[in-house]
UniProtKB/Swiss-Prot annotation:
SUPFAM superfamilies documented for this protein: Nucleotidylyl transferase, Ribosomal protein L25-like
A single GO molecular function term of this UniProt record: glutamine-tRNA ligase activity
Keyword annotations from UniProtKB, A to Z: Aminoacyl-tRNA synthetase, ATP-binding, Cytoplasm, Ligase, Nucleotide-binding, Protein biosynthesis
Disulfide bonds: none
Main localization, broad class: cytoplasm
Gene Ontology biological process terms from the UniProt entry: glutaminyl-tRNA aminoacylation; glutamyl-tRNA aminoacylation
UniProt-annotated binding residues for L-glutamine: 67, 212
Entry protein name: Glutamine--tRNA ligase
Pfam families from the UniProt entry: tRNA-synt_1c (PF00749), tRNA-synt_1c_C (PF03950), tRNA-synt_1c_C2 (PF20974)
Catalyzed reactions per annotation: tRNA(Gln) + L-glutamine + ATP = L-glutaminyl-tRNA(Gln) + AMP + diphosphate
C-alpha cells in the first residue's frame, strides 16, 4: 500500500473537512514553526508529517517559519539543519522560508496598539518578583504596583526599552488581562523582554524581543494560516492566542488546535536533557545514531519513508501516551526487509579452512534480494579459506543448535555443505582455526544421498574479505521512561554501543554513505555518514532482524 493510498483520518482532518464543507475556509494553510535552538527529533517529525501532510493532501500550503525570538539560544547552524531535515523527510515548504523576526517591526506596532488601548504596561518588577506575584494554581496572583501606569507613561518607557536604556531584567512589557484568572497563562503574561544579544537574522537592530505567545498568533495571522496545529502543552496558551488576536487590528483570525505530543520509550526528547548528553560527551554529538534526532536516526540508517510510516501508524489523537520503541523499529525493519539489498558480513570472525577444496577461487552468483529479482545479483568469490562468525561453531551442542558442530554438517549460504573435522587452538584454549571438508556436489542443491542438513550459516572469503568496523547500536537507556528518573543519566545503557572488528564481502568495498543493507543473519546496517570511507569501512547497526528487547522484558 502506498502512502497516498493509506491517507489517514483523525480529528484534525475531520475539522478541516467540516471547515471546507461549510465554507469557513476555501483552502488549507498550515505551518511548521520550530525554534532554531537545537536539532529536530522524532517528536518534531510527527508535527512535520501532520502539517506538511495535511497541506499536501488538501492541495493547500504549508509554511516553514523559524520562531526566532530568543537570540541567546538560537544559531544559523540549527536553521540549516532544520531545513535539511524537513527536505530529507520528503517535504517542501510553500514559498520562501519565513522568520518570526521578519515581523518584528509589525509586532512592535501591535504592542504599541495594546498600550494605547490600555491593555499592556511596562512592568519593573524583577523576574523573581513577577513569578512571586503570579500566584499558584491554588492562589490568585496579585497586581504589580506598576500595573496602573498611564498610557503615555507606558509608551515612553516602552520606547526607552527599545532604545536600550534599561538593563536586562529591569523592565518588560506585560499584557493587562486578569491576575485572578484560573489560567496562569492569562495572569498578565510578559509580551516583550530585554536581551542584549546579536540576532542571527537581525544583527543588533533590536534589544527587545517578543515572547512566543505574542509572536506566534500574530505570525499565523499575518501568513493567513487557517489551522494552527500544536501539541497539547499549548492548550491553555490558546486562550492567550485568541486574546491577542481579538485585541489588535488584524483581519485574519486563525484557530489553534492541539494534538498529543510523541513520547517515545527508552529515550528523552527534552532539549535540555539532549544537550546534556552532548555536552557531557555521553554521545558523539547531535547526530549520534543513538539520539532521537532526525539526523541521528538518519545516520543510524533509518529511512525517511520509515519515519513517515511510523508517524502514520501512531496517528494523531488528543490524549498523550507512550509509544514503544519497538513500534519505530518495526517500521524500519519492514522498510529495509522490503528494500535493502542483502550482503554477508562476519562481525566476530574465526578462520575456517576447507581442506579437500583445491586452491584458487570460485565465483558464485547471489541474488541481491531473495524476493526481488529486479534488484539483480552480485558476484561473490568463494575459496578454501573463509571466515565464519565465532558464534556459529561449537565443539559440542544440543539438537536445537542448527549451526556448525564438530563432526557434523551445515550449509554455507548460497554455497556448499561443509563438515567440521577438527579445530586448532591457541595457548589460552581459544579456537583459531576450524578445519572442514566439503561436498563438492552440493552447490545450491541437496546431497544426492538424501541426507538432511538443516543449518545455514553466512561466510566471507578470507582471501577477498574487506576489513570493516561494526558499530552495534542499541537503546540509549535501560528503562522505558528515563526522563521520569531523578537522575536520568544513571539509566544509560552501557551496551548502547558495542564496536566489533570483522569483514564484509568485497562487493561492499565501495559502500556509499547511508547505503543500507541487510547483513544476512545479523541485522540491518548502513555505511556511517561521518566515519566510513573506502580506506576505513564503518557500518552502523540500524536494527536487529527481530526485537530482542521483547524477550528481555518478558524474562
Amino acid at each position: 500500500m502506498s502512502e497516498a493510498d493509506a491517507r489517514p483520518t483523525n480529528f484534525i482532518r475531520q475539522i478541516i473537512d467540516e471547515d471546507l464543507a461549510t465554507g469557513k475556509h476555501t483552502s488549507v494553510h498550515t505551518r511548521f514553526p520550530p525554534e532554531p535552538n537545537g536539532y529536530l527529533h522524532i517528536g518534531h517529525a510527527k508535527s512535520i508529517c501532520l502539517n506538511f501532510g495535511v497541506a499536501k493532501d488538501y492541495q493547500g500550503q504549508c509554511n516553514l517559519r523559524f520562531d526566532d525570538t530568543n537570540p541567546v539560544k538560537e544559531d544559523v547552524e540549527y536553521v540549516d539543519s532544520i531545513k535539511n531535515d524537513v527536505q530529507w523527510l520528503g517535504f517542501e515548504w510553500s514559498g520562501d522560508i519565513r522568520y518570526s523576526s521578519n515581523y518584528f517591526d509589525t509586532l512592535y506596532q501591535y504592542a504599541i496598539e495594546l498600550i494605547n488601548k490600555g491593555l499592556a504596561y511596562v512592568d519593573q518588577l524583577s523576574p523573581e518578583e513577577i513569578r512571586e506575584y503570579r500566584g499558584t494554581l491554588k492562589e490568585p496572583g496579585k497586581n504589580s504596583p506598576y500595573r496602573d501606569r498611564t498610557i503615555e507613561e507606558n509608551l515612553v518607557l516602552f520606547e526607552k526599552m527599545r532604545a536600550g536604556e534599561f538593563d536586562e531584567g529591569k523592565a518588560c512589557l506585560r499584557a493587562k488581562i486578569d491576575m485572578a484568572s484560573p489560567f496562569i497563562v492569562m495572569r498578565d503574561p510578559v509580551l516583550y523582554r530585554i536581551k542584549f544579544a546579536e540576532h542571527h537574522q537581525c544583527g543588533n537592530k533590536w534589544c527587545i524581543y517578543p515572547m512566543y505567545d505574542f509572536t506566534h498568533c500574530i505570525s499565523d495571522a499575518l501568513e493567513g494560516i487557517t489551522h494552527s496545529l500544536c501539541t497539547l502543552e499549548f492548550q491553555d496558551n490558546r486562550r492567550l492566542y485568541d486574546w491577542v488576536l481579538e485585541n489588535i487590528t488584524i483581519d485574519c483570525r486563525p484557530r489553534q488546535y492541539e494534538f498529543s505530543r510523541l513520547n517515545l520509550e527508552y529515550t528523552v526528547m527534552s532539549k535540555r536533557k539532549l544537550n546534556l548528553l552532548v555536552a557531557d560527551k555521553i554521545v558523539e554529538g547531535w547526530d549520534d545514531p543513538r539520539m532521537p534526532t532526525i539526523s541521528g536516526l538518519r545516520r543510524r540508517g533509518y529511512t525517511a519513508a520509515s519515519i513517515r510510516e511510523f508517524c502514520r501508524r501512531i496517528g494523531v489523537t488528543k490524549q498523550d501516551n507512550n509509544v514503544e520503541m519497538a513500534a519505530l523499529e518495526s517500521c524500519i525493519r519492514d522498510d529495509l526487509n522490503e528494500n535493502a539489498p542483502r550482503a554477508m558480513a562476519v562481525l566476530d570472525p574465526v578462520r575456517l579452512v576447507i581442506e579437500n577444496m583445491p586452491e584458487g577461487e570460485q565465483i558464485l552468483s547471489m541474488p541481491n534480494h531473495p524476493n526481488k529479482p529486479e534488484m539483480g545479483s552480485r558476484e561473490v568469490p568463494f575459496s578454501r579459506e573463509i571466515y565464519i562468525d565465532r558464534a556459529d561453531f561449537r565443539e559440542e551442542a544440543n539438537r536445537q543448535y542448527k549451526r556448525l558442530v564438530l563432526g557434523k554438517e551445515v550449509r554455507l549460504r548460497n554455497a556448499y555443505i561443509i563438515k567440521a573435522e577438527r579445530v586448532e587452538k591457541d595457548a589460552d584454549d581459544n579456537i583459531t582455526t576450524i578445519y572442514c571438508s566439503y561436498d563438492d556436489q552440493t552447490l545450491n542443491k541437496d546431497p544426492a544421498d538424501g541426507r538432511k542438513v538443516k543449518g545455514v550459516i553466512h561466510w566471507v572469503s578470507a582471501v577477498h574479505a574487506v576489513a570493516a568496523e561494526f558499530r552495534l547500536y542499541d537503546r540509549l537507556f535501560c528503562v522505558p521512561n528515563p526522563g521520569a528518573e531523578d537522575d536520568f543519566l544513571a539509566t544509560i545503557n552501557p551496551e548502547s554501543l558495542v564496536i566489533r572488528q570483522g569483514f564484509v564481502e568485497p562487493s561492499l568495498a565501495d559502500a556509499k554513505s547511508e547505503q543500507t543493507y541487510q547483513f544476512e543473519r545479523e541485522g540491518y546496517f548502513c555505511a556511517d555518514s561521518c566515519h566510513s570511507s573506502a580506506e576505513n569501512l564503518v557500518f552502523n547497526r540500524t536494527a536487529g532482524l527481530r526485537d530482542t528487547w521483547a524477550k528481555i522484558s518478558q524474562d
